[in-house]
């Protein structure tokens, strides 16, 4: 009888984007930091990402977050983000889902009211504030990465689209920021397929023309994201709202507006001088879901004025499950995965033994 290989998952969604939190079934990864463990997965064990984001186990529109031990003693746990485009060092929606999962699993004890704790992403420490009411995690507020404008109102000719004006923001990944109305979109759900086609063409054109380098991280690869911006409506003093849509290359229109997309929009509004510290922006997706970003201040980093911000959203629990991996299945590719799998339901070292029962219930 062949050995049974399994992964333990908690599935949640934030704004419609599903995050699959891997809580067990993976051996300890090489690397002294979360960033080094992420790089090991990317270079030597990309099969985990491919497995859970491909049929028959998943689809590219999902994300995966692997819990790993934190390297910083301030953090409760580390997490590695995986998406269709690869390994972003940060994501707001994935952070909201991961923070909710560690509370719902008991890894971080849940308390009524407001509580704070720290997670460790590949980008560094992330401060979390959770709001718990009647035992339910009603909201997670997490730090957005310091965000800035790399390019403001450049122009490019895109075959099948025409001349496109775009800005580029960094908020955990580089985003092309485009005005939806200028491209003929109202940001309604029935436009989803055309939005994906348009974004694909624009991103391909920008990637072919130029690359982008972060002021401390250096080359972080080709531009992976595009954010369609609707008009901004002021709904109260210091509170704004805008329909928005985020595209992830290749081919994915996000269900939510995304946390990093919201941070990128805050950076652009700050660059244009329309925000004051404490101002908030609610981005609203094609499905009517939203995140609230708050501009908390700015500082100079080299040649860039970075916008500090927080993102608030709610994650909804979907499932706790054991995924059975059969490497004899012709639809399952285990070549870049088998060497990190643990047999027999053993938890990853990120999770204490005493939490095993509550996580597998």
Swiss-Prot record:
Pfam families: Pro_racemase (PF05544). Substrate binds at residues 92-93, 259-260. It catalyses: trans-4-hydroxy-L-proline = cis-4-hydroxy-D-proline. One of its GO terms (molecular function) is 4-hydroxyproline epimerase activity. Keywords: Isomerase. The keyword Isomerase applies. Its EC number is 5.1.1.8. The keyword Isomerase applies. The active site is at residue 91. It is an enzyme of class 5 (isomerase). Coiled coil: none annotated. SUPFAM superfamilies: Diaminopimelate epimerase-like. Belongs to the proline racemase family. In vitro, catalyzes the epimerization of trans-4-hydroxy-L-proline (t4LHyp) to cis-4-hydroxy-D-proline (c4DHyp), albeit with very low efficiency. The physiological substrate may be different. Displays neither proline racemase activity nor t3LHyp dehydratase activity. This is Protein Csal_2339. It comes from Chromohalobacter salexigens (strain ATCC BAA-138 / DSM 3043 / CIP 106854 / NCIMB 13768 / 1H11).
């Amino acid at each position: 009888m062949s050995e049974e290989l399994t992964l333990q998952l908690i599935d949640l969604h934030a704004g419609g984007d599903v995050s699959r939190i891997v809580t067990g079934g993976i051996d300890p990864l090489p690397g002294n930091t979360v960033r080094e463990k992420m790089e090991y997965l990317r270079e030597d064990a990309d099969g985990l990402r491919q497995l859970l984001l491909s049929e028959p186990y998943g689809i590219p529109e999902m994300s995966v977050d692997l819990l790993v031990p934190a390297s910083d003693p301030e953090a409760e746990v580390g997490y590695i983000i995986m998406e269709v485009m690869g390994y972003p060092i940060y994501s707001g929606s994935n952070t909201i889902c991961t923070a909710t999962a560690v509370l719902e699993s008991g890894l971080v004890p849940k308390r009524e009211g407001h509580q704070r704790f720290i997670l460790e992403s590949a980008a560094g420490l992330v401060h979390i504030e959770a709001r718990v009411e009647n035992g339910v995690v009603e909201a997670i507020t997490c730090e957005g990465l310091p965000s800035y404008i790399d390019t403001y109102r450049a122009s490019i000719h895109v075959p099948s689209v025409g001349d496109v004006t775009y800005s580029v923001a960094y908020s955990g990944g580089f985003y092309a920021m485009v005005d939806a109305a200028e491209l003929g979109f109202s940001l309604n759900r029935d436009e989803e397929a055309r939005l994906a086609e348009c974004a694909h063409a624009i991103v391909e054109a920008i990637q072919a023309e130029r690359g982008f380098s972060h002021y401390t991280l250096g080359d972080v690869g080709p531009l992976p994201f595009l954010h369609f911006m609707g008009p901004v409506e002021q709904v109260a003093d210091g509170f704004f709202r805008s329909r928005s849509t985020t595209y992830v290359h290749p081919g994915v229109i996000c269900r939510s507006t995304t946390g990093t997309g919201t941070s990128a929009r805050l950076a652009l509004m700050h660059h244009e001088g329309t925000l004051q510290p404490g101002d908030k922006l609610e981005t609203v997706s094609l499905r009517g879901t939203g995140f609230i970003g708050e501009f908390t201040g700015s500082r100079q980093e080299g040649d860039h004025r970075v916008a500090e911000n927080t993102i608030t959203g709610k994650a909804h629990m979907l499932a706790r499950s054991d995924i059975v991996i059969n490497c004899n299945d012709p639809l399952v590719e285990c070549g870049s995965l088998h060497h990190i799998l643990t047999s027999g339901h053993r938890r990853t070292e990120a999770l204490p033994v005493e939490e095993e029962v509550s996580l597998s219930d």
